[in-house]
Amino acid sequence: MFRPRHGTALHSIARLSGQVARDADGRPVGDGDFAAQVEQCYLNVATALAGVGGSFDDVAKLTVYVVDWSPEKMPLLGEGVGRAAAKLGIDPVKPITLLGVAALGEPDLLVEVEATAVIEQP
């Protein structure tokens, strides 16, 4: 089995693949818990950014894919983002596109977060 590549930096632009609710060992996080999955996605975005020499401060845009989106999910989205922000010590407010989708790559996934970042190169 191969290890997934979570992102790449080309010149000073990093485009991260969609981060999902999996821990560092690939185990599911937050089964059925939307806020917990959002939190894990944001934590994974931060980890992937560090892997390409960046940080959450470098994020230029986020795209969030939510299964069966409805406005009633907004408080849970905010809860998950807030918990991740507190753990990471970051300002999570970034330009964002939120898209409702029918399904994601695996049946337990409720949310996926992609990021584009501009990273200063030494």
Residues of each region from the PLM?
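Short, polar/acidic, helix-capping and beta-turn segments at strand->helix junctions
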Residues: M1-P122
